[in-house]
Amino acid sequence: MSQVNRRKVLFVTSELADLVKTGGLGDVSAALPRAMRHLHDVRVLIPGYPQVINSGNPIHIISQLGGHAALPPCKVGRMDMKDGLVIYVLICPELYEREGTPYADTNGRDWSDNHIRFARLGLAAAEFAAGEVKSQWCPELVHAHDWPAGLAPAYMRWRGQSTPSIFTVHNLAYQGTVSTASSRELGIPDEAITPEGMEFYGKLSFIKAGMAFANHITTVSATYAREITTPEFGCGLEGFLQSKADKGQLSGIPNGIDESWDAATDEHLICHFAPNEWTRKEINADYVRELFELDASSGPLYAVVSRLVYQKGLDLTIGVAEHIVNNGGQIAIIGRGEPEEEDAMRELAARFPGRIGVRIGFNETDARRMFAGSDFLLMPSRYEPCGLSQMYAQRFGSLPVARNTGGLADTIEDGVTGFLFNESTVESYTEALNRTFQVFAHPELLNAMRCRAMAAPFNWHQAVEPYAELYRDLLKKNVSMTSN
């Protein structure tokens, strides 16, 4: 695309994998702007958490923004990454410079003022789009991600701004709800607190605000876009979302993964390998067994790389664990999450020493080595908007065993690149696992599936063009509306 046609796009997010992440949102927020920069000038706005401020990347203050209602004044800094990606940092120490995650303290308790913290992010995005940030760069389109950025499209609408916006739902279950009593301190107009606006069963919902006031809603897979219009997956918003779908304002665009996920070159792996170099893949498996204190074995190695939360169906994995062990398999589990889920994983490992190992926490290097060393990845998610782990695993020749839902259904070809099961039951899961035992017993079939999985086209190019087309449509409509 010529420089003349490059448009200015501001991503608004609470996570960026380069600096801070708790899940797939951080990966997407880092990868998609980079994948799109040959088409558009895409920059990112993120809160100034300690992980951002202390990242070692220079930050140059470019502007100051005043307060609004209970939202404090703040500064905006510019950070230039080594590869050229421009990050705008919202600097407000009283809101963001705290130990913990972007959302919770070191004990896992949500910050009581999260509504203030992320409303300030949304307002800053609106101020950016209005040209109130003293910068030569002003976005022509704002792309907000998940509930922490939900008020960005809302403030833009309430302030009468014409800049178009997109809101992407990464996980509808996390909605950012707060009492309606907070409306005054957030500067929310009364007319926005309606069923058509951000009111949700007597509360205010940040995610609903993003969906209600953005020009278009996207989700991270085509199947999930359909699922969230149904009671099973709609989290109480299915009717609202169906009305958006009926108006052509809801679409599903799949995520991708970046090019670093290459078994032949990944710097994290113990041993690089290519398709049909399975003895080299086994060297990674040996490392995983040693890391998780598993016995030496020639049986199948199953990996769990996951947040340890109810959504991920880990209770189902506990229910099938003995069946896996009795069939000669081993399980390596890494992740962190809800305390009761973490305790359940520890208890599972204690029941099967040498056969099941667990490491509470998350380490990117070890996770990559697990994808490379395992034969199968377990993903029995109750729902999965997109999922990235199943794509990482396939790229490294580990075949996913997953529930047939959301992005898992869109990215796994059953019996070709992995194994899908339909019901969230131990019985349905067990049937899929029995197929893995059969495939593992026939190396020529196992290796053929591995080759197909490693060749799957999970790059970001599949997402870039649909987003670019959506950007073009919204910008064209905006020009038409503002010229009338």
From Swiss-Prot:
It comes from the Bacteria. Its EC number is 2.4.1.21. Transmembrane segments: none annotated. It catalyses: [(1->4)-alpha-D-glucosyl](n) + ADP-alpha-D-glucose = [(1->4)-alpha-D-glucosyl](n+1) + ADP + H(+). Pfam families: Glyco_transf_5, Glycos_transf_1. Pathway: Glycan biosynthesis; glycogen biosynthesis. InterPro entries: Glyco_trans_1, GS/SS, Starch_synth_cat_dom. The keyword Ribosomal protein does not apply. One of its GO terms (biological process) is glycogen biosynthetic process. Disulfide bonds: none annotated. PANTHER family: GLYCOGEN SYNTHASE, GRANULE-BOUND STARCH SYNTHASE 1, CHLOROPLASTIC/AMYLOPLASTIC. ADP-alpha-D-glucose binds at residue 21. Synthesizes alpha-1,4-glucan chains using ADP-glucose. This is Glycogen synthase. Keywords: Glycogen biosynthesis, Glycosyltransferase, Transferase. It comes from Pseudomonas syringae pv. tomato (strain ATCC BAA-871 / DC3000). The keyword Glycosyltransferase applies. The lineage of its organism: Bacteria, Pseudomonadati, Pseudomonadota, Gammaproteobacteria, Pseudomonadales. It is an enzyme of class 2 (transferase). GO terms for molecular function: alpha-1,4-glucan glucosyltransferase (ADP-glucose donor) activity; alpha-1,4-glucan glucosyltransferase (UDP-glucose donor) activity. Belongs to the glycosyltransferase 1 family. Bacterial/plant glycogen synthase subfamily. Signal peptide: none annotated.
